[in-house]
């Protein structure tokens, strides 16, 4: 929960900075309004910056243009604000690691990505729980430590869930680097009851990883040795796996780096990186897919 603590402190700092911008003689309502506006402006600015960077680095010509780009920006800003101003700093404190074992349906383990925590999955977890699935979440160490440390933590959680319900299938639902970790662990374990759903995962790296030491640590660059070596030997995902990605992802650049060119691929347009993990349409589609 260290990330939640950091995000809480950052949020409090933004609220304080916004309130401090008001005149000393200003009303309490004026100070409160400015306190709330500043975090929103930061979210909007970061979303615009991400869109511009992705557009400059991705020459595929598949990204949204014109009015569709503005719709994308609005949706991604809402997802960004929800995740980093509400769900991850605040709601994550109220999410237990796993549900009580009452369901006979599959288990779902939600795996977050870079600079995120379990709060990312607040809405989706409630929806799957309401459908009768047993759900679990995990907080992984920062990616820049080492992908192997993340895999060790994830493996420990998987073994615990499998031991508690050995007859139930276990679905790893991973967003971003969580999707990469889920695929790597599936490849390592070779467990017939283990299933993978990856969402917006940089399976072949992202050009934006250069600022985070992306060759050996952190989100991987396309030239990362460890990722190239893994992809060269990895097994193809089975037909019951899902690899969802969007041509408008502003974090995985180029967006096609998420593609595996397998039957598991499902390509969408109009969704940003965080929007993929917060979309009601994608949630409902995935619920239907897992029922089949």
Positions of predicted regions on the chain:
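Post-His helix in hydrolase/transferase enzymes
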Residues: 277-289
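Flexible, membrane-associating and regulatory peripheral segments of lipid-active enzymes
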Residues: 1-108
């Amino acid at each position: 929960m260290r990330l939640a603590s950091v995000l809480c402190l950052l949020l409090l700092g933004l609220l304080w900075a916004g309130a401090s911008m008001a005149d000393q003689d200003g009303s309490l309502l004026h100070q409160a309004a400015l306190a709330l506006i500043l975090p929103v402006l930061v979210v909007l600015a970061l979303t615009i910056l991400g869109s511009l960077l992705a557009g400059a680095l991705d020459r595929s010509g598949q990204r949204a243009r014109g009015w569709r780009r503005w719709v994308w920006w609005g949706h991604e800003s809402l997802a960004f604000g929800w995740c980093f101003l509400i769900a991850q700093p605040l709601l994550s404190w109220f999410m237990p690691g796993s549900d009580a074992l009452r369901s006979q349906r599959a288990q779902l383990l939600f795996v977050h990505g870079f600079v995120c925590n379990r709060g990312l999955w607040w809405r989706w977890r409630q929806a799957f729980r309401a459908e009768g699935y047993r759900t679990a979440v995990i907080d992984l160490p920062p990616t820049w430590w080492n992908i192997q440390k993340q895999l060790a933590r994830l493996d420990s959680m998987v073994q615990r869930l499998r031991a508690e319900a050995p007859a139930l299938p276990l679905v790893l639902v991973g967003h971003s680097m969580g999707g990469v970790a889920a695929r790597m662990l599936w490849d390592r374990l070779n467990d017939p009851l283990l299933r993978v759903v990856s969402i917006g995962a940089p399976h072949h790296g992202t050009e934006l990883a250069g600022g985070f030491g992306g060759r050996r640590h952190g989100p991987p660059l396309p030239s990362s040795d460890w990722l190239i070596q893994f992809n060269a030997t990895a097994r193809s995902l089975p037909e019951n796996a899902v690899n969802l990605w969007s041509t408008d992802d502003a974090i995985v650049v180029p967006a096609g780096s998420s593609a595996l060119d397998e039957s598991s691929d499902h390509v969408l347009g109009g969704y940003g990186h965080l929007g993929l993990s917060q979309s009601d349409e994608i949630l409902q589609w995935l619920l239907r897919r897992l029922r089949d």
